[in-house]
Amino acid sequence: MIFLETPIFTRRIKQLVDDDQYRELQLRLLAHPDAGDLIPRSGGLRKIRVGLAGRGKRGGARVIYYWMTARSQIFMLLAYAKNEQDDLSDEQLKMLRALVREEFG
């Protein structure tokens, strides 16, 4: 499995979790790429919870990704803390769908 990252994802994930926590997330997705919940009306985007120190998974971070099964790739799109944002806005969904279409056709 290959992991691809958007620049904004790379920047935000470094602010939210340490290298060990990120590696743990990658290993979880390697074992179960469908672990994240499908986001309605997103064209296949998934959202997975990531625990943050002192907050656990429920109050931690959210990672938005797309699993391209045919290419065995996971496109890491966006990461944010739960206290910053609950769900993606319609505009964010539209932008992320466009990124996925651009990358995978």
Predicted features and spans:
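Arg/Lys-rich, positively charged N-terminal/basic patches that mediate binding to nucleic acids
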Residues: M1-D20
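Short Gly/aromatic-enriched secondary-structure transition segments
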Residues: I13, L25-Q26
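Amphipathic alpha-helical transducer elements in NTP-driven molecular machines
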Residues: D19-Y22, R58, L93
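A short, surface-exposed loop/turn module that caps and links secondary-structure elements
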Residues: L27-K57
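Short, surface-exposed coil-to-beta transition loops
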Residues: G59-V63
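Enriched for short, Lys/Arg-rich terminal
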Residues: W67-G105
